[in-house]
């Protein structure tokens, strides 16, 4: 055939119309007419497939077919083809030589070529005669015409099965078609045509292997394709078919023609399995896909071109010339595509193709194929005679042919439209780039190169309107219900353009349009094409859709029309009816657009996708717009069309117009079908296929038709019976329908909106708003969409909207029950579940009514207000999905669906396969029975629990008992689950499973061993198990795959707590999923209940203090595993807090318990030896705690809000701020605070009552504020302050913090607002921290200085008067940290209060921040962000800390310990750490905080910097991410001022009474740390790093060393001191400070170091802050203090150079620089001073701490670490290390003494320490670090001596000024310019006065640390400590610099670097030695 066809082509130009031509040419003709014949022949020979595309526009269509065939050929017959191509080429050349003029006379030539090709394929020769005889006078159009048919009748033909489309049956079929459709008698076409048809249909039977491209295309359904491919069959019919097909895509016929003309190709096709049309089509397509096609074009192009040229020349000479003109341009255009591959070949192709095209054009012209296509094949029928030859090509009318000439090749067009290649590798004809995989193609089509090539293509073919043509195709397809004809008509031009369409076909069958058009050309092809197209389009439609999304709207446009046409062929009536229904529903236009865009968007329903336009790319984006539309109703395509490019719009319009015409026609039918049409919206983002939709609704009845509008994510479904629609609507009321796991919304098109609303309302009613409905947000990223149960609650949709849960204020944080706010938006009740439980709680508390931001209607769900509706939003979509399902189920249960709920039961499906099944498949098991409510798939146990209506369950059991179902080879066992089974209670199900495995398991005590892990990937169970095994044996586990959740049962509660703490501090990512971890919510249920009480509110502060718990609770809440009841019962925060609290002090009073929760330190202290004092404090603390906890509850809400904000970031920030706003009463509260202060001082009970009242007020205010999310960020701070004042210390802290906060708070709030605006709290915080730090630093410093100066006496008095109160405040500040978070904003309050608040706040804030960070971040922020945030916090904390540390190391120690403990607590380590750490931490915190009120300045500086970071984080977290931003901002402000003012000395002074407790607490804390080491350490580190990266890191380093020293001793006892490296250091520092306070020397050293840290951090490396005398002391003590300062200051450089990284350096540029300067100093001096080394140790420990959390963990885990720290301290003689070591060990003893002589400690501490340090510095450093008070005292003395030495060394510089004379004033005067330093200086001056009065105690350092705040107030007289001045001391180089610049220059000097390196080396060496000694000693 090929040869004959080819010859006939050569002969055919004139003869083609003749029977021989049809026979020989017919195959070519149908494919490309004469040209196509040549092409087909060349396809085989030269892979003419590509060439045919190039040959002519019609050939482009032809190419479509041939391409496909060729593609297959390429695959199957690549070698044979090559051979044949060669033969064909030679033959063609020969033929060309012979009959150039008579290309249409190819018949003869064909015989010649056949001879040549016969060698390759003998059949060709045989068929060629047949072809000749068959095609002699008739082309496809002529054949059709002979039957009185037109191209449009091809559609009818396509309806015949391929099997029937045999040459024998074809005439009968054609006649039948004629009789039925045309009413004409089908002329008896010669059997030749039938034979030809047979050949076409039976590629094997005839050389026209695949007219059967239809089969190749895989459209067995399309008899048209067969016919098309059987152009030989009735010439008229074939011609018509070809015309239509050519119009459609000319490729299908072309392949046949090509194959025919290229007889060997046909043979090859057959040989290559192309004989079977169906197989050939598909295989051909696949083979041909892109590159092969290109290859064919290239290889076959030239050879084919030459023969074709000759033939074409003759043809051109013939009437075909006109046709060729029309067709040639397309062929040429097509050629360019190919020609890009082979320009020469393309040209050749074009030349020969022109003649061929001419012949085909002649046919087309005569037939008016285009007209025929559009109007029907009447014209083609007419024209086939004169143009019969061309009629093969003429499928394109002359105009079409002309267009073709001007059009690119089909391959080029396919590439232009980004049609998915059918075969890979695909060679982009535009770019000559080979894409081996679809992925590569998708990437390539989005490259600038390809886009530019597309641009050039359009320029190259100005006559080609890629958009218009596709639209025309669409129009043609759509206008004429007989899409085949129309398709062929409109597509033929389009195809000419769309030769690309053939390309597309080749590339991706998904472009149904192209494929379909080829079918259209030949009815058989069309039909088959359609059927296969459908199957393929369905399978590939995603690709198509993807392609459009990829930015290949072209593909969509071209494809959608084809799809539509195919679809029309398949069910044009149905489709019309559907479309009509759509239009009638008012969505007609939109629907048309949808159709067009549909093709562009996704090939859900191939036929449905009209070609939006060649520029379908725009349509890709319209999907997003349409998403919103679909959200509203999914009806209007206007948004999409708007979004679409104008071209696309124009195409869409055109298409829609034609579609409208179709629809109009269909409207009549529509009326019949209208009631049976459904609109499905919110389809999956990744698209769905028609088959998916059918599969979903098949259970309800027969699905007549499906129309998918991908760009709108909508589909129209026509059911056979209206009853099915009713059943569906009823069904969806109770059970959401899901496609690919995403719930879709379903409504009746006409009533779409109304129904959606009704349905969703019904759903809401039925589910009482518990069902979260899907909300389509254009910004899916902004919120998690929770789909109401009505619309399947799908995780995918959960992304779009976040269900907000309003916490009712009355519930307070304790009632964290998440209330589902359901709003009905566009028929969608959307429940936004705050990702973070805190916000949920807040919102839930806020309003019983569920408010949906996106919802048009807020649905009040009073019952739901407390519904936990497990609308626990997971951080991830999975969580959201789970939450959605849980929420829906829960809501359903909680809501009036009680009937349903009562009727609901749980089905157990067991024996599921290990893999290979989807949630949908499990859903499908129950879906047909209706009443499906929820599902829980336990993939780990191969079980699934399905919550379903009882009746349905019974039916289900009966059915599956009778008809067992297999899934992946496993026979499922379906039975009823126990009656009491609650599918939402994942833990209960887990326990059931545990019982099955271990009947003896103790269920009562098992909950505390559960660890809930959410957001797991599908294959993440093993990873999680591996993680769990690191913390202990995993006894049992369950993986809930559909909720992406796992529950592990570890061997002990400690392991669970450790794992939880670790994962909280170190969120783990598995792939793209960040794990969220939580403990069993049931552990905290009691506390949650308590939380409901005012006491519980206290607990909620505690929870805040341990945000980890909140996180856990929230995670629990977020994770479906948390039951709504659990959520209701326990507020998320309180759950975790309680767990920790219960573990720590379950026996404490509720008030105390609350206090403990808020301040575990308080409880611990009580538990500790200081229990009496603590008890005294506890009343105060309790009262304070009550107020604080009430406030904290608010704060907790804020914290929750903060967390929510973290997850929701800015949005929620406003709400969190609202809680603060609720705190707005804080103005009055301030007065109250003062009153509270008095009350607390006077009567703890009164204070408690008062605070409690305030707290309640605050809670109410918070509730109100929550309502007004951003009402007042500042006021919330005030409220916090108000709560804080409840405790004198807390009040002072609050006031201080408020004062600082007010300035900072204003900025912070503003920034917070800004941050709220921003979505990433971390980023905002970071930026804000820096900006605010810089801005607020001066203000904060000034405020802090003033406040500190004021507070110092007041705080000292307060703490002295209420030492326990101080502790209580310390505890309270934990609550307060929440409150202080608020208080931070309200800096206006008295600074002492602020300081106290800040001190406690740091913990609470750290906790909250950490918890929030961890919580929120795990949920909303990527782990990197969390880490970054944590780093930021650490940096902030570090900066603050270094400042504090510099201000006073002791202060740093005491302050940092609380801070760190707060950090640890805040970091979710707090509670766990608090539990273990509570003893120490609580003790410290109490001591610390009691001191902190006094020492608040330094703590405020340091803690405030940290806590501001943390407290402000809390404050700002409640506000929103701003909390953190503000934290960062405030950190800069607070870091310096707070650290300097709230000096650790002050804290220590206040803490001294509790220091005795602290030692036990330390041990306890270490134990706790051991218990919660990882989480706490990690949290602490992360938090510390992130929260107070600047101050904390430096401070943490120093303090950490101290704490580590302390906790090393304790760590020896408690291996888990590790967890709280920072805390440990903090505790140690606190202990040291307390010891120092008791023993002035120790405290002074710590203070000096702390102040140095504070100063260096706060002020530009206020290492000089140490008074010169102190520096001298430090120097005397081997610069121990200086070393501390140096180490701290140096820590940054050391960290940088060594592993020691100063958060300060890292955190803040300014502070970092100052710290570096200080460090430079220190480092320069350190080598000289062992103290410096000690500092380095501290630094290293700190860096380890901060970075690794390892030092603490190591110290905890390894007593070696403690020993190392001690040894390091001893060896290094760092003041910090020594002090820390001494104070750590000595703190235990000294702290008792210090606790007794808290007021005396500053002088004693420093003086004693100095002496001891000098005397027994190194020896005692070791012994002190290991032994205790004596060593500590000695160390303090040594440190003092060293500090003095250092100071002396530094004395010449500013430091001397500051230090000795306590040149605080000088320092202040000297560096007043520095906001922080100046402020610190002024405070230091005050403090210096105090210190001067207490010179013994090394007030210098105390002053430095207290100069920040408390020290002045606490021990104003005794604080001889260095005034935070601008001087800097380099401990490493033992040099003092008056200015930061000088220090910076020094630090940059080579000498300093060398000294630092030496120092680091020495430090490392000493550390190693110490470690070795410790190990040996151990």
Curated annotation (Swiss-Prot):
What ranges does the record list as Basic residues composition bias?
486-543
* GO function term, MF aspect, one: zinc ion binding
Which InterPro entries does this one have? Matrin/U1-C_Znf_C2H2, Matrin/U1-like-C_Znf_C2H2, Nucleotide-bd_a/b_plait_sf, RBD_domain_sf, RRM_dom, ZNF638_RRM1/2, Znf_C2H2_jaz, Znf_C2H2_sf
Start-end of Basic and acidic residues biased regions: 470-485, 570-582, 590-604, 840-856, 1294-1322, 1329-1340, 1479-1506, 1793-1806, 1888-1906, 1954-1978
Major location (coarse)? nucleus
Q: Where are the zinc fingers (Matrin-type)?
A: 1928-1958
- Which PROSITE patterns does its entry note? RRM, ZF_MATRIN
Q: What does this protein do?
A: Transcription factor that binds to cytidine clusters in double-stranded DNA. Plays a key role in the silencing of unintegrated retroviral DNA: some part of the retroviral DNA formed immediately after infection remains unintegrated in the host genome and is transcriptionally repressed. Mediates transcriptional repression of unintegrated viral DNA by specifically binding to the cytidine clusters of retroviral DNA and mediating the recruitment of chromatin silencers, such as the HUSH complex, SETDB1 and the histone deacetylases HDAC1 and HDAC4.
Return the domain comment text from this UniProt entry: The matrin-type zinc finger domain is required for localization to nuclear speckles.
Mind telling me what this protein is named? Zinc finger protein 638
């Amino acid at each position: 055939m090929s040869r004959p066809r080819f010859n006939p082509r050569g002969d055919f130009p004139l003869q083609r119309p003749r029977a021989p031509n049809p026979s020989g040419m017919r195959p070519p003709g149908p494919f490309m007419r004469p040209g196509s014949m040549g092409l087909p022949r060349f396809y085989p020979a030269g892979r003419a497939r590509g060439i045919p595309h190039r040959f002519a526009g019609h050939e482009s269509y032809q190419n479509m077919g041939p391409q496909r065939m060729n593609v297959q050929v390429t695959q199957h017959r690549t070698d044979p083809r090559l051979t044949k191509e060669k033969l064909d080429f030679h033959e063609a050349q020969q033929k060309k030589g012979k009959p150039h003029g008579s290309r249409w006379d190819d018949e003869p030539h064909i015989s010649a070529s056949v001879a040549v090709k016969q060698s390759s394929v003998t059949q060709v020769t045989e068929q060629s005669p047949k072809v000749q005889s068959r095609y002699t006078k008739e082309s496809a159009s002529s054949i059709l015409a002979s039957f009185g048919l037109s191209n449009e009748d091809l559609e009818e033909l396509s309806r015949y099965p391929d099997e029937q489309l045999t040459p024998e049956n074809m005439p009968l079929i054609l006649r039948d078609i004629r009789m039925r459709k045309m009413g004409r008698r089908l002329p008896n076409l010669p059997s030749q045509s039938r034979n030809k048809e047979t050949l076409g249909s039976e590629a094997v039977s005839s050389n026209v292997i695949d007219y059967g491209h239809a089969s190749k295309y895989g459209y067995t359904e399309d008899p048209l394709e067969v016919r098309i491919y059987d152009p030989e069959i009735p010439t008229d019919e074939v011609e018509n078919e070809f015309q239509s097909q050519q119009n459609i895509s000319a490729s299908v016929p072309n392949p046949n023609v090509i194959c025919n003309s290229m007889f060997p190709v046909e043979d090859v096709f057959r040989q290559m399995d192309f004989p079977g049309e169906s197989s050939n089509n598909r295989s051909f397509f696949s083979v041909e896909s892109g590159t092969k096609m290109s290859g064919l074009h290239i290889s076959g192009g030239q050879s084919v071109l030459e023969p074709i040229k000759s033939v074409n020349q003759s043809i051109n000479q013939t009437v075909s010339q006109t046709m060729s003109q029309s067709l040639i341009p397309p062929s040429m255009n097509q050629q360019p595509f190919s020609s890009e591959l082979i320009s020469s070949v393309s040209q050749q192709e074009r030349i020969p193709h022109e003649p061929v095209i001419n012949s085909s054009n002649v046919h087309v012209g005569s037939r008016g194929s285009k007209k025929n296509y559009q109007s029907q094949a009447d014209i083609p029928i007419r024209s086939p005679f004169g143009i019969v030859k061309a009629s093969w090509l003429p499928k394109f009318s002359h105009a079409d042919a002309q267009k073709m000439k001007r059009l690119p090749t089909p391959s080029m067009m396919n590439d232009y439209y980004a049609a998915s290649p059918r075969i890979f590798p695909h060679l982009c004809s535009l770019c000559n780039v080979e894409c081996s995989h679809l992925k590569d193609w998708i990437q390539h089509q989005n490259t600038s190169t390809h886009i530019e090539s597309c641009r050039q293509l359009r320029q190259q073919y100005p006559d080609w309107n890629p958009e218009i043509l596709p639209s025309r195709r669409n129009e043609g397809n759509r206008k004429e219900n007989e899409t085949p004809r129309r398709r062929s008509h409109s597509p033929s031009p389009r195809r000419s353009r769309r030769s690309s369409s053939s390309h597309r076909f080749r590339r991706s069958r998904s472009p149904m349009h192209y494929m379909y058009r080829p079918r259209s050309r030949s009815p058989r092809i069309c039909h088959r094409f359609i059927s296969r197209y459908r199957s393929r389009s369905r399978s590939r439609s995603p690709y198509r859709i993807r392609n459009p999304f990829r930015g290949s709207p072209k593909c969509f446009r071209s494809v959608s029309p084809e799809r539509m046409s195919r679809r029309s062929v398949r069910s044009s009536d149905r489709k019309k009816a559907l479309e009509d229904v759509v239009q009638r529903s008012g969505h007609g236009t939109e629907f048309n657009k949808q159709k067009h865009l549909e093709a562009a968007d996704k090939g859900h329903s191939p036929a449905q996708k009209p070609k939006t336009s060649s520029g379908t790319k725009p349509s890709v984006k319209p999907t997003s717009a349409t998403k919103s539309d679909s959200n509203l109703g999914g009806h209007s395509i206007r948004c999409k069309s708007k979004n679409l490019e104008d071209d696309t719009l124009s195409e869409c319009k055109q298409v829609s117009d034609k579609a409208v015409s179709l629809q109009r026609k269909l409207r009549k039918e529509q009326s019949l079908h209208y009631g049976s049409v459904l609109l499905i919206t919110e389809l999956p983002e990744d698209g769905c296929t028609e088959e998916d939709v059918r599969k979903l609704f098949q259970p309800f009845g027969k699905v007549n038709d499906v129309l998918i509008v991908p760009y709108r994510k909508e589909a129209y479904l026509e059911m056979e019976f209206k009853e099915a629609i009713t059943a569906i609507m009823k069904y969806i009321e109770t059970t959401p329908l899901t496609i690919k796991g995403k719930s879709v919304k379903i409504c009746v098109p006409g009533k779409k909106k109304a129904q959606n609303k009704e349905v969703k309302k019904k759903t809401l009613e039925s589910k009482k708003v518990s069902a979260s409905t899907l909300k389509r947000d254009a910004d899916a990223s902004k919120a998690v969409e929770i789909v109401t149960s009505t619309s399947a609650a799908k995780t995918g949709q959960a992304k779009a909207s976040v269900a907000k849960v309003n916490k009712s204020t009355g519930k307070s944080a304790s009632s964290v029950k998440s209330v589902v706010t359901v709003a009905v938006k566009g028929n969608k009740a959307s429940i936004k579940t705050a990702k973070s439980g805190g916000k949920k709680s807040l919102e839930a508390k806020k309003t019983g009514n569920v408010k949906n931001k996106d919802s048009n209607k807020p649905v009040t769900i009073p019952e739901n207000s407390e519904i936990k509706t497990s609308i626990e939003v997971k951080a991830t979509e999975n969580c959201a999905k789970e939450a959605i399902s849980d929420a829906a189920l829960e809501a359903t249960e909680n809501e009036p669906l009680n009937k349903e709920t009562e009727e609901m039961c749980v089905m157990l499906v067991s024996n599921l396969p290990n893999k290979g099944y989807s949630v949908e498949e499990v859903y499908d098991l129950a879906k047909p029975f209706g009443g499906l409510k929820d599902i829980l798939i336990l993939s780990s146990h191969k079980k699934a629990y399905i919550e379903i209506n009882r009746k349905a369950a019974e039916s289900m059991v009966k059915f599956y008992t009778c008809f067992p179902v297999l899934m992946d080879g496993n026979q499922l066992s379906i039975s009823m689950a126990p009656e009491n089974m609650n599918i939402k209670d994942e833990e209960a199900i887990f326990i059931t499973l545990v019982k099955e495995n271990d009947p003896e398991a103790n269920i009562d005590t098992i909950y505390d061993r559960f660890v809930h892990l959410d957001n797991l990937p599908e294959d993440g169970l093993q990873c999680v198990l591996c993680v769990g095994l690191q913390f202990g044996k995993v006894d049992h586990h369950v993986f809930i795959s559909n909720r992406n959740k796992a529950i592990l049962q570890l061997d002990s509660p400690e392991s669970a707590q450790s794992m939880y703490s670790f994962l909280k501090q170190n969120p783990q990512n598995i792939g793209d999923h960040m794990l969220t971890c939580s403990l069993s919510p049931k552990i905290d249920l009691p506390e949650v209940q308590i939380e409901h009480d005012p006491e519980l509110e206290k607990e909620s502060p505690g929870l805040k203090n341990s945000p980890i718990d909140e996180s856990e609770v929230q995670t629990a809440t977020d994770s479906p595993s948390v039951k709504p009841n659990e959520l209701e019962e326990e507020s998320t925060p309180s759950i975790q807090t309680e767990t920790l609290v219960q573990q720590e002090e379950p026996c404490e009073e509720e008030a105390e318990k609350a206090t403990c929760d808020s301040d575990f330190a308080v409880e611990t202290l009580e538990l500790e030896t200081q229990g009496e004092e603590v008890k005294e404090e506890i009343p105060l603390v309790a009262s304070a705690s009550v107020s604080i906890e009430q406030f904290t509850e608010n704060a907790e809400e804020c914290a929750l809000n903060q967390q929510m904000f973290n997850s929701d970031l800015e949005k929620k920030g406003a709400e969190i701020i609202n809680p603060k706003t609720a705190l707005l009463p804080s103005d009055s509260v301030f007065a109250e605070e003062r009153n509270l202060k008095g009350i607390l001082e006077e009567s703890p009970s009164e204070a408690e009552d008062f605070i409690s009242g305030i707290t309640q007020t605050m809670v109410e205010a918070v509730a109100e504020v929550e309502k007004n999310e951003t009402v007042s960020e500042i006021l919330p701070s005030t409220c916090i302050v108000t709560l804080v004042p409840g405790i004198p210390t807390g009040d002072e802290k609050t006031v201080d913090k408020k004062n600082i906060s007010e300035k900072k708070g204003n900025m912070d709030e503003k920034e917070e607002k800004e941050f709220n605006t921003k979505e990433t709290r971390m980023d905002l915080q970071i930026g804000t921290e820096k900006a605010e730090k810089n801005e607020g630093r001066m203000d904060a410093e000034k405020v802090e200085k003033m406040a500190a100066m004021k507070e110092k006496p007041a705080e000292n008095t307060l703490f002295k008067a209420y030492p326990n109160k101080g502790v209580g405040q310390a505890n309270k500040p934990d609550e307060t940290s929440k409150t202080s978070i608020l208080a931070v904003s309200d800096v206006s309050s008295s600074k002492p209060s602020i300081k106290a608040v800040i001190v406690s706040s740091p913990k609470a804030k750290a906790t909250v921040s950490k918890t929030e960070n961890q919580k929120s971040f795990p949920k909303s922020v990527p782990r990197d962000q969390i880490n970054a945030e944590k780093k930021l916090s650490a940096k902030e904390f570090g900066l603050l800390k270094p400042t504090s540390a510099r201000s006073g190391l002791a202060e740093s120690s005491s302050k940092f310990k609380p801070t760190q403990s707060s950090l640890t607590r805040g970091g979710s380590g707090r509670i766990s750490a608090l539990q273990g750490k509570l003893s120490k931490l609580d003790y410290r915190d109490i001591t610390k905080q009691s001191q902190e009120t006094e020492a608040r300045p330094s703590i405020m500086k340091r803690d405030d910097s940290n806590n501001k970071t943390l407290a402000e984080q809390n404050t700002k977290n409640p506000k929103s991410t701003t909390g953190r931003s503000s934290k960062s901002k405030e950190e800069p402000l607070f870091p310096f001022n707070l650290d300097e003012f709230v000096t650790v000395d002050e804290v220590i002074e206040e803490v001294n009474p509790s220091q005795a407790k602290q030692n036990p607490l330390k041990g306890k804390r270490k134990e706790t740390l051991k218990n919660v080491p990882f989480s706490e350490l990690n949290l602490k580190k992360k938090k510390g790093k992130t929260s107070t990266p600047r101050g904390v890191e430096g401070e943490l380093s120093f303090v950490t060393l101290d704490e580590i020293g302390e906790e090393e001793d304790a760590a020896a006892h408690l291996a888990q001191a590790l967890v709280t490296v920072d805390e440990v250091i903090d505790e140690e520092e606190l202990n040291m400070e307390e010891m120092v306070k008791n023993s002035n020397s120790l405290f002074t050293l710590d203070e000096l170091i702390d102040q140095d840290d504070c100063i260096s951090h706060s002020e530009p490396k206020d290492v000089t802050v140490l008074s010169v005398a102190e520096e001298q002391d430090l120097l005397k003590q081997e610069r121990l203090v200086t070393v501390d300062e140096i180490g701290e200051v140096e820590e940054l450089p050391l960290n940088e150079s060594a592993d020691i990284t100063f958060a300060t350096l890292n955190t803040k540029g300014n502070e970092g620089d100052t710290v570096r300067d200080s460090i430079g100093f220190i480092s320069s001096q350190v080598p000289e001073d062992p103290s410096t080394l000690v500092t380095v140790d501290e630094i290293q420990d700190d860096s380890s701490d901060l970075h690794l959390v390892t030092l603490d963990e190591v110290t905890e885990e390894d007593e070696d670490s403690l020993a190392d720290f001690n040894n390091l301290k001893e060896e290094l003689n760092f003041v910090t290390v020594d002090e820390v070591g001494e104070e750590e060990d000595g703190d235990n003893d000294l702290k008792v003494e210090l606790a007794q002589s808290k007021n005396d400690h500053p002088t004693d501490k420093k003086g004693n320490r100095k002496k001891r340090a000098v005397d027994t510095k190194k020896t005692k450093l070791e012994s002190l670090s290991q032994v205790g008070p004596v060593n500590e005292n000695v160390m303090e003395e040594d440190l003092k001596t060293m500090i003095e030495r250092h100071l002396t060394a530094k004395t010449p510089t500013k430091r001397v000024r500051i230090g000795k004379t306590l040149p605080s004033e000088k320092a202040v005067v000297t560096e007043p310019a520095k906001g922080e330093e100046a402020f610190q200086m002024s405070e230091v001056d005050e403090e210096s006065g105090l210190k001067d009065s207490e010179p013994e105690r090394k007030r210098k350092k105390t002053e430095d640390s207290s100069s920040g705040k408390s020290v002045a107030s606490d021990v104003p007289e005794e604080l001889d400590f260095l005034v935070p001045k601008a001087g800097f001391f380099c401990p490493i180089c033992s040099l003092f610099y008056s200015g930061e610049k000088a220090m910076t220059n020094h630090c940059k000097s080579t000498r300093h670097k060398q000294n630092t390196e030496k120092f680091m080396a020495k430090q490392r060496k000493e550390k190693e030695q110490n470690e070795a000694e410790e190990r040996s000693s151990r």
